[in-house]
């Protein structure tokens, strides 16, 4: 599996300026994904997901546990990055990162229940037993919001990773640096780079993500964009969740 975070196209492609909304100052710029780079990331995610699904659940839990620990250890840095790019007061940013841990703990405590086999029934003489087992669905797209990227994103990418799926995570273009921080923490925690990948950019990058044959798309954002996603997902019978 790849071990490097791919944050967009090669030098010379489109760039996104990250602007501090409080001061108007440009913090930095980042590479914006093109349809070609999104397609390449999807292909890597497909390969990575197959390997990730074979990883023992306790080992996947260990990676997610470590991700949570790293986030709590680096609250000040993560909060400063979040406030700097989207304008939230620093106390609210700290509280958001702190609150991330409760979400992680919930999913860690319940993933075994979600993945446990269920007895669906048996015939009268007991010779036939029906059971339901659960498997990962594959590669999912996670399009997150600008205002609470840790809360909104983690509600999708944490359970997705725990249950053996790969994630193409598209933060809002107004929370791109926070997306990079999340990806760095994931990799440091042991999640393979192909299994959790960033898609950076605005509507064009989001459209390119939706063009991939995803197993599911999870979106938080505007009504207008959500409607377009729902229509596209319906045409392909793709799993979809909108907020």
Regions inferred by a protein language model and the residue ranges of each:
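N-terminal Rossmann-like NAD(P)+-binding subdomain of aldehyde/semialdehyde dehydrogenases
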Residues: 1-128
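Active-site-adjacent beta-strand anchor residues
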Residues: 31, 143, 168-172, 199, ...
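Short alpha-helical
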Residues: 36, 73, 77, 88, ...
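Small-residue (primarily alanine) positions within well-ordered alpha-helices
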Residues: 45-48, 160, 179, 233
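Hydrophobic packing residues within well-ordered alpha-helices of enzyme cores
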Residues: 104, 179-182, 209, 229
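Conserved small-residue-rich beta-alpha loop and adjacent elements
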Residues: 121-193, 242
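Conserved NAD(P)+-binding/catalytic subdomain of aldehyde/semialdehyde dehydrogenases
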Residues: 139, 190-243
């Amino acid at each position: 599996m790849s071990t490097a975070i791919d944050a967009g196209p090669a030098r010379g492609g489109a760039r996104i300026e990250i602007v501090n909304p409080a001061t108007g100052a440009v913090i930095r710029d980042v590479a914006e994904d093109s349809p070609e780079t999104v397609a390449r990331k999807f292909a890597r995610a497909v390969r990575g997901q197959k390997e990730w699904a074979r990883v023992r659940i306790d080992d996947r839990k260990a990676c997610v546990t470590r991700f949570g620990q790293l986030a709590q250890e680096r609250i000040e840095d993560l909060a400063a990055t979040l406030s700097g790019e989207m304008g939230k007061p620093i106390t609210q940013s700290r509280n958001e990162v702190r609150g991330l841990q409760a979400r992680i703990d919930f999913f860690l405590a319940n993933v075994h229940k979600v993945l446990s086999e269920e007895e669906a029934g048996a015939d009268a003489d007991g010779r036939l037993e029906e059971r339901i087992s659960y498997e990962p669905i594959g590669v999912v797209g996670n399009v997150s919001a600008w205002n609470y990227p840790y809360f909104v994103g983690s509600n999708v990418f944490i359970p997705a990773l725990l249950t053996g799926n790969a994630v193409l995570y598209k933060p809002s273009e107004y929370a791109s640096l926070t997306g990079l921080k999340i990806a760095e923490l994931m990799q440091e925690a042991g999640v393979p780079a192909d299994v959790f990948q960033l898609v950076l950019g605005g509507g064009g990058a989001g459209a390119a993500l939706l063009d991939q044959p995803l197993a599911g798309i999870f979106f938080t954002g505007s009504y207008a964009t959500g409607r377009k996603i729902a229509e596209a997902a319906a045409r392909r019978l793709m799993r979809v969740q909108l907020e």
